């Protein structure tokens, strides 16, 4: 479980960076979508870690608050980029 959490967590900024380095906004949007999927996967692993006793509830709540904040940032970035594509 620990390796899955690390992999999902590392995938989020990696996909954002890769998307930003692409030539087209649509490609960036695609990578943001992948990053969002990795974030959702991370949230799931955190919840499961609490249920099976790898992390305690306080740790998981703190981490889930951070994932929620990241999710909102990704959504705002996505909306901003979608406006560029529509223009």
Language-model features: locations:
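Short, C-terminally biased terminal segments at protein or domain edges
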Residues: 1-87
């Amino acid at each position: 479980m620990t390796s899955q959490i690390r992999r999902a967590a590392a995938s989020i900024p990696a996909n954002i960076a890769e998307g930003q380095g692409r030539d087209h906004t649509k490609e960036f949007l695609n990578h943001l979508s992948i990053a969002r999927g990795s974030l959702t996967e991370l949230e799931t692993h955190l919840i499961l870690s609490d249920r099976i006793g790898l992390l305690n509830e306080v740790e998981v709540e703190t981490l889930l608050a951070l994932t929620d904040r990241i999710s909102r940032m990704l959504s705002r970035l996505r909306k901003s980029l979608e406006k560029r594509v529509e223009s």
